Amino acid sequence: MKISFFVLLTFFFFFSFFSLLSSNEQSTKFDSSINQLCDDSDSLIENSNSRYFDNSYSLNYESLYSFRNGITKTIPQRINILTPDAQQWYRNLENIVNNSKQTWDPDRFKDNFDAKIILKNNDFLCTMNGRIRFTGDYMDHVLKKENMYISSLEVSLNEGNILQNRKFKLFIPRTRQGENEIFMTSIFQELGFLAPTTFFVEIDFNGDVNTYLFQEKINAEFLQNNNLKEGPLLESNAPPPYKWDDKSIDLARIVNETWLIQNDINFQYGFKSLEIYSKLRIFHDQNNNSLMDLNYERIDTISASNLRQFFLLNVALQNYHSLTVDDRKYYINPQNDSIVPIFYDGGSHFLNTKHINYQPFTYAENEDYGEIILDINYLKEIPILKQKINQIDLDKLANLLKDRGLSQENIDFIQNNLIEELLSRLDKIELVISNNHIKKENSVLDYFQKSEENLNLNYIVFKDKENFKICSPDLIDCFTTNLSYDDQIKLLNGRLKIDDKIAFYVSKNLDSLYSKNSMNEMFEFKENIYGIDIFSNQKINYEINDKSRLIKIKPKNQGKYLISNSELDNVTIDLSYDELSKLDSENNFDEARYDKTFYTGCLNIYDSNMKNVSIKVTNSPCEDSVNFVRSKGYINSIEINGSKFDSIDADFSEILFMNTLILNSGNDCVDVSKGEYKFEILNLQNCFDKGISIGESSTVRIEEMSVSDSYIGLAIKDSSEVDINFYKLTGTEYCYASYRKKEEFGPSKLKINQVNCNDSKTFSQPDSFIVVSDDS
């Protein structure tokens, strides 16, 4: 009876669904803004129906701002999902079950269904439109419950987000070994590896409540949440698991197609990223487990070290499922060609078998895992991994696991035994590492001809400039052709078929495939000055003053400079470009914003600590005059004049700016995101767009700020919080603006103690939290 009632109820939602899609349009002068999170017109469900929509949060939110911002930052206990076409949804699940009794092919039934995703807290309600579909490769993703089926889901939100995720998976817990998946993703994150955030959540699906595993999808938002700039995300382009074996061709494909098509630089780099993976996979050891083995000899040493540590940790925790090639995922950093592993679908029973004596390479009765050979190169990584394990903050980890739903019994075990257990397991692994193993490397032909079937199923593709060489896997029959742009995208995405055969991109040519990859190829020039390694894409012409520790660099046009993983102490950097003519400026517009270095700044400071640093940049032709990424410390003074685009851009950083003077920026004078920033004195003049732009969940404190002759003095966006003591502006159209620009964030909070807007306009979306004392 309950389900029948919900069929009627959801019919009402289906009737109103499409009218809602167009009711939220908001007309503003801010073209980049989007609707407020959970627009009020979406909240159709009155409190009289609250019996069906229990509270999603145990926290008591006192304001609309805190509730909506909490959606982006706080783990929900319950998510309500309604499907307008509930009958068709359940019919689709029945078809999946019936199909499994014949030939299991779940992709036939992964259709998208419209849905409403609802979060509630006391009197506050948030309704978001989205789509859901079945997800999973095996029948364990469908569960029969009484007279109906439930399944694992993939949810895509048309607008809004949950915990900064617009796309996420909801797994039936048994498909990911329940609490084990929460623990595994959390411990990998704690040790500095990439892993999707995972936690238990109650799902009320059309009135039926069950516990699921919420897991963020590995996409652009995942990279952003891990303080990484977007680049290619790779996974194996293997046949479905029920068809894949050790004879299959299983090279990679790029899954984030949106990044590929943003510009030609990204598109061209896509081919290089797949070549990097080909170097890993093709030359695997013939004597090793062919379903798991990779070859690290042709990639950079830092990536190889990280990959070996990742493999060791998975072996210690018995995540053998995630080590099979078809389940592995990678991020390729286009700035240095490094390849970074991503934990996914471990399959471990660690928490269920924690009291059983551990033996390496044993997992239930699976003999395949006993075929793994770890060579002597793994020995040097064990002490490094042990050091990381010894530095685990167990109290912090325990609190995180509690929030994500782990039982107290397992949390107690982790706090009392985890470090000792992991160190003991690594000791046992060390004993089985082979000191005298001699690798027998696959050749290209060995890999592609593992099975005669590959000749009938596949083509392999090489790209030399604009021409593509299409070959049979035995490299005997080849022809040269041009591929359209759309076909090239399909090739990179693993969807291209030629004569009904799957086409795998390999590399530029065989010589390129056999050569070793190295980091910082674009920044081939290097100088060490005052103990600081400075890299550049051109010869570094500089002068120094030892008394003032001044480094004065005179670059040629489009010269870029990189300082990475450094300690900058009591140093001044002066970067002065020749002023571009108007013609040169117009001709080099795209080159300045997008180039093959993938660094946006003229001066790029990455992963570094700064103390008493001063910076001066003049006539910057780059997207950013200075770009700080994942850096910390304080800057005594920074002065920038004549930037073609942005002057200061800071991402994922924690920086104190003492004295900041920006003059004549072609776009924003200051742009900060995803970090914590403090400005003592901030003077911004003649900023073409914004004086300061603050976004992506940043926290900013400004003691004294003045803005003149700009379009917008202060823009605060996307879950950011800003506290300003004194703010003065002149000749500026908008004093401040508070709005959402990206769907994965929520409203922002602005507090100004003293401001003189001088009759300038203001703009704020209704759910912004604004406290301003205007003295004008």
Where are these regions (language model features)?
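ATP-dependent phospho-/nucleotidyl transfer catalytic cores
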Residues: 219-316
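Conserved ATP-binding subdomain of kinase catalytic cores across diverse folds
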Residues: 119-254, 319
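Extracellular beta-rich repeat passengers
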Residues: 504-776
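Bacterial N-terminal signal peptides
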Residues: 8-16
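Active-site acidic catalytic loop and adjacent metal/ATP-binding pocket
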Residues: 81, 155, 299-351
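C-terminal catalytic region of ATP-dependent kinase domains
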Residues: 318-319, 331-457, 464, 492
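Regulatory N- and C-terminal appendages and interdomain linkers associated
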Residues: 2-4, 17-127, 409-548
